[in-house]
A protein has these predicted regions:
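Short, positively charged and aromatic/hydrophobic N-terminal segments
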Residues: 9-11
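Bacterial N-terminal signal peptides
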Residues: 16-28
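OB-fold and OB-like single-stranded nucleic-acid-recognition modules
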Residues: 31-134
Length: 134
């Protein structure tokens, strides 16, 4: 094997080893870039992102047909800039979310949609919610 072939082989081997590390680093950077404030959520409608803020108000509509649980962030309803909504059919996975998450700093991941001109994420799995500081 001549020197040029050896250098070429070493270059290819190094690139193969480096590629997974570069891809992992890029994925971490993109994940961090998707973390947004509750006030910025309105600018990311129809996008999947992680929205972070403090739950200052909650409401469980146990008498309604859909039995929604609402987690209102940063300001009490109706002034909350962002809401996480847990549908009734998923509620059992969360225990009592209106008590568990009240006054907690959370990050919620999912597709941001608009309802009544306000951004929200429909939360169907506990893995979509992370308590900050844990």
């Amino acid at each position: 094997m001549d020197i040029e072939s050896t250098i070429g082989w070493i270059t290819i081997a190094a690139m193969r080893l480096a590629f997974p590390l570069i891809a992992l680093s890029l994925a971490c950077l993109l994940a961090a870039a998707d973390k947004i404030s509750t006030s910025a959520a309105k600018d990311h409608l129809e996008q999947t992102a992680t929205v972070c803020g403090k739950v200052v108000g909650t409401r469980y509509l146990d008498q309604s047909a859909n039995k929604f649980t609402f987690l209102n962030f940063d300001k009490p309803y109706p002034d909350s800039p962002f809401t996480a909504v847990i549908p009734g059919e998923n509620r059992a996975k969360f225990g009592e979310p209106e008590k568990t998450y009240l006054e907690k700093n959370l990050c919620v991941t999912g597709k941001i949609v608009e309802y009544n001109k306000k951004p929200e994420i429909i939360v169907t799995e506990p893995s979509q919610i992370k308590v900050e500081g844990k």
